[in-house]
């Protein structure tokens, strides 16, 4: 930049005027604020919300206790204990997720070879005490059973992009 251009930019404060013009444009535009509990915005099919454990159509849980999700979790929010059954298959006896630690990165869902752990599109959940956000295997299976149709639809919508 030449010295003359630099002089005119600093003397006439062009950057300041550009910023004020931008502020002025947004002052008179329609506002985009959403009043959350009453109004809702559309949720992406890839939204990562509350976790759920899925079952097969015959009612058997999908988790094979490979512990990949526990290993890949950067926040160490997943705890898994497993045992071998009589038919030599491994299943979980304990599958806990501490949502106060979870950063909702989706690594657990991506690493699962059988699509057992998924993150649903549920974003409205709360806990009155700290322990309320500690989800056990039974709670995760209940979420999966309740929202299986929504989970399957979201998986089908996202399938072409995987």
Curated annotation (Swiss-Prot):
Bilayer topology annotation: Peripheral membrane protein
One record GO biological process: aerobic respiration
GO cellular component term of the entry, any: plasma membrane
Cofactor(s) of this protein: [4Fe-4S] cluster
Chain residues that bind [4Fe-4S] cluster 2: 73, 102, 105, 108
HAMAP family (UniProt xref): NDH1_NuoI
Protein name in the entry: NADH-quinone oxidoreductase subunit I
Origin organism lineage: Bacteria, Pseudomonadati, Pseudomonadota, Betaproteobacteria, Burkholderiales
Gene: nuoI
């Amino acid at each position: 930049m030449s010295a003359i251009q630099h002089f005119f930019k600093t003397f006439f404060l062009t950057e300041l005027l550009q910023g004020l013009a931008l502020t002025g444009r947004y002052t008179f535009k329609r506002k985009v604020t959403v009043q959350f509990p009453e109004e809702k915005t559309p949720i992406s099919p890839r939204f990562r919300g509350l976790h759920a454990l899925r079952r097969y159509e015959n009612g058997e849980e999908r988790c094979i206790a490979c512990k990949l999700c526990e290993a890949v979790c950067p926040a160490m929010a997943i705890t898994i204990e497993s045992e071998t059954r009589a038919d030599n298959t491994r299943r979980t006896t304990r599958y806990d997720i501490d949502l106060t630690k979870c950063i909702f990165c989706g690594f657990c869902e991506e690493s699962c070879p059988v699509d057992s752990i998924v993150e649903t599109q549920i974003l409205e959940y709360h806990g009155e005490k700290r322990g309320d956000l500690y989800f056990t295997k039974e709670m995760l299976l209940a979420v999966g059973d309740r929202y299986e149709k929504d989970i399957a639809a979201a998986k089908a919508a996202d399938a072409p992009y995987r």
